[in-house]
Amino acid sequence: MRTLIFVLFTALASSAMAEESARVTDRGAFVNLVQGKSLTSLGVRLTVSPSGSIGGRAFGRDISGTWTWNNGYFCRTMQAGDRVFPRNCQLVQQNGNRLRFIADKGAGATADLRIR
């Protein structure tokens, strides 16, 4: 289960992102990127709604959570099965159809998710 934590918005094997990545600093810009889309990687499919909910599945487990935008960071809490993951504020970068989430306000592990 600990592995699931890192895959979901923190990291395991992240694909490389080119240096043209641009930081997403605005809630409205973030919502425009994810609204009506899924965020995916191997074994993971998530939806992030404009209303502040997170849902989906990862490695056969249901994922639920909430998110807010706070001072330029995506801040989320999540639950996978019966495990609750505390709030973590993450720096978000965009490169084409990919988003990179960097935990701990940009100082932590990364997770790359494709926008579909």
Sequence positions of predicted segments:
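Sec-dependent signal peptide recognition
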Residues: 1-7
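Lipid interaction determinants
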Residues: 5, 14-116
